[in-house]
C-alpha cells in the first residue's frame, strides 16, 4: 500500500471545510449503523468476514502468483480468519489483446482450492496500482494504456503521487470513455466470472482496485473525485456488473470509491443496478501512511465513519472494507488505533480484509516466524462468522476478552457459527435460551468454529469468555 503524502497537499482548504461539515455528527457519537444491510449467504445467514489481502505483486508470467502459497491460507485459518482478498492482474490474465492466459487462470484456481481446503471465502480483486505496467506497476495491460503523449515522471519515494501525473490520469480517462477499452474490460470480467462462478471458495468480485481519474483545470481533488465517481465509475461499475452477471448470477460484486474517501469525504458514486452489490472502501489515513503515529485527538476515525456510511445507507447495500492497516504498527499510539479502528469497523461493516498477509516487515501481518507483528494480534478476536437469525447485539470487550452475541433465531437451514482464535486460556461458551452446541469449551492454543443451533423464533444469547489457563 502506498504512502499518500500527496493527497493532503492537493485537497487543501476544501477538505478542511468538508471535515468541519461532518464534525457535528462525529461529536454526537458513532454513526448509527441502522439502515446498512448485512452481508448474507445463500441460506440467509448474516455473515461477518475477517481476513487479509493476499498478493504477489513481484512475479509475472510463468512465476505469476507464485509468492502465494497454501501456507497463507492454513496460517490465516489457524488464527480464526475466514476471508481473503486475492489480488489478480489484468496484465497477467490478458498480456496480449484477446489472448487470455490459461496458465494464469489455473494459478488462480489452485489458490482458490487452497482457500476451500481451509474454509476461507475469497474476493477476487482486479488490482491496479498507478494504472499498470506502462508506468512501472501492475494492473491494466500496456496494450490498453493510452496517454495521448502526455508526460509521466516516476516518483519512487512517493509512488502514490504518480496517480497525478498527466499520462496516468489520461490513461484512466481512456479506460472509462473509449468504447473498445470498455468492451475489453467487460470481456476480461466475463472470462473470470465464467471460470470461477461455481468455485465454492468464491464470494465475489472486486471490479477494480482504488480507481482514480483525470482532474480538470481549476478543479480541486474532492470535486474531481465526486465527478469521477458519479460520471465515470458509476457507469463503469454498471457495465462490469452486467458483464459478470452474463456468466455468474450468484456471487457478490464489490465496488470501490476513489481512495479520497480515506480523507473523510463522502463518495459521489451513484446507484449500481445489481441485486448483490457490496460497497468496499479502503480505510487509510494519509498521515499514518507517511509514517506518523495515530493522533486520537484528530477525530479521523469518527470523520471517516460518518462519511463512509452515508452511501451504503442511501443505497441499502452492505459494507466490507477491502484494505486497511498502518505501515508503522508499533508506534506509541498504535495499540489504541487498532482498538478504536476495530470497534469502528464492527459498528457499520460486514467485515474487512487487512493489508496484507505476508511474512516479514512493513505492512505484513506476521513476521518470518508466523507470529503477529506488534498490535496486529488485536485483529484475531472472536466473531460471529454466520448468524442463523436476526442479530440483536454483537459485542466484544478486548479488555476482558468476552464476546457476546444476541440474536433471534430463524427457521433457515444452517447453524450460527462463532469463530474463535487460539487463546492461551482456551474458551468457555455459555448459552441462554433454547439453544445447544456440541462445543461448550475450546482447549487452549486452538482456533475453533463453534456451531450453535436454536429454536426458531427464540432469542438466543451466546457468551464466549476466556477459559482457565493451563
Language-model segments: what does each one mean?
Residues 30-36, 423-426:
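A short, compositionally biased
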Residues 158-161, 280, 330-433, 443-470:
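Aromatic-rich peripheral "rim/lid" segments of glycoside hydrolase catalytic domains that contact
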Residues 1-27:
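Secretory targeting and sorting signals
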Residues 58, 285-287, 358:
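Short loop/turn segments at secondary-structure transitions that flank enzyme active sites
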Amino acid at each position: 500500500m502506498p504512502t499518500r503524502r500527496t493527497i493532503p497537499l492537493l485537497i487543501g482548504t476544501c477538505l478542511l471545510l468538508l471535515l468541519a461539515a461532518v464534525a457535528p455528527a462525529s461529536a454526537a457519537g458513532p454513526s448509527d449503523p441502522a439502515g446498512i444491510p448485512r452481508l448474507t449467504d445463500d441460506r440467509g445467514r448474516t455473515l461477518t468476514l475477517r481476513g487479509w489481502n493476499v498478493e504477489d505483486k513481484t512475479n509475472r508470467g510463468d512465476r505469476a502468483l507464485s509468492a502465494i502459497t497454501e501456507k497463507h491460507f492454513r496460517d490465516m485459518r489457524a488464527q480464526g480468519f475466514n476471508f481473503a482478498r486475492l489480488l489478480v492482474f489484468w496484465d497477467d490474465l490478458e498480456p496480449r489483446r484477446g489472448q487470455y492466459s490459461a496458465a494464469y487462470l489455473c494459478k488462480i484456481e489452485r489458490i482458490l482450492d487452497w482457500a476451500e481446503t481451509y474454509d476461507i471465502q475469497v474476493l477476487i480483486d482486479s488490482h491496479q496500482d498507478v494504472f499498470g505496467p506502462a508506468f512501472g506497476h501492475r494492473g491494466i495491460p500496456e496494450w490498453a494504456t493510452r496517454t495521448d503523449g502526455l508526460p509521466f515522471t516516476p516518483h519512487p519515494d512517493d509512488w502514490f503521487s504518480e496517480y497525478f501525473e498527466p499520462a496516468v490520469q489520461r490513461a484512466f480517462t481512456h479506460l472509462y470513455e473509449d468504447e473498445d477499452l470498455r468492451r475489453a474490460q467487460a470481456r476480461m470480467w466475463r472470462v473470470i466470472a465464467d471460470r470461477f462462478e461455481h468455485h465454492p471458495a468464491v464470494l465475489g468480485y472486486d471490479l477494480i482496485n482504488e480507481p482514480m481519474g483525470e482532474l480538470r483545470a481549476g478543479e480541486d481533488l474532492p470535486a474531481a473525485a465526486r465527478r469521477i465517481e458519479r460520471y465515470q465509475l458509476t457507469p463503469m461499475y454498471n457495465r462490469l456488473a452486467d458483464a459478470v452477471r452474463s456468466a455468474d448470477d450468484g456471487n457478490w460484486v464489490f465496488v470501490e470509491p476513489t481512495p479520497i474517501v480515506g480523507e473523510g469525504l463522502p463518495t459521489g458514486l451513484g446507484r449500481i443496478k445489481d441485486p448483490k452489490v457490496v460497497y468496499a472502501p479502503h480505510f487509510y489515513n494519509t498521515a499514518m501512511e507517511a509514517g506518523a503515529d495515530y493522533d486520537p485527538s484528530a477525530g479521523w476515525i469518527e470523520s471517516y465513519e460518518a462519511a463512509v456510511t452515508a452511501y451504503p445507507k442511501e443505497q441499502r447495500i452492505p459494507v466490507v472494507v477491502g484494505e486497511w492497516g498502518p505501515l508503522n504498527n508499533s508506534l506509541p499510539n498504535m495499540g489504541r488505533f487498532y482498538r478504536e479502528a476495530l470497534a469502528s469497523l464492527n459498528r457499520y461493516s460486514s467485515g474487512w480484509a487487512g493489508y496484507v498477509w505476508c511474512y516479514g516487515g512493513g505492512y505484513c501481518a506476521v513476521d518470518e516466524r508466523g507470529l503477529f507483528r506488534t498490535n496486529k494480534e488485536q485483529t484475531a478476536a472472536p466473531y460471529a462468522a454466520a448468524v442463523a437469525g436476526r442479530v440483536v447485539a454483537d459485542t466484544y470487550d478486548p479488555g476482558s476478552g468476552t464476546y457476546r452475541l444476541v440474536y433471534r433465531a430463524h427457521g433457515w437451514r444452517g447453524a450460527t457459527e462463532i469463530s474463535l482464535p487460539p487463546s492461551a486460556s482456551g474458551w468457555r461458551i455459555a448459552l441462554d435460551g433454547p439453544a445447544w452446541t456440541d462445543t461448550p469449551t475450546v482447549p487452549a492454543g486452538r482456533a475453533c468454529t463453534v456451531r450453535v443451533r436454536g429454536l426458531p423464533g427464540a432469542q438466543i444469547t451466546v457468551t464466549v469468555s476466556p477459559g482457565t489457563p493451563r
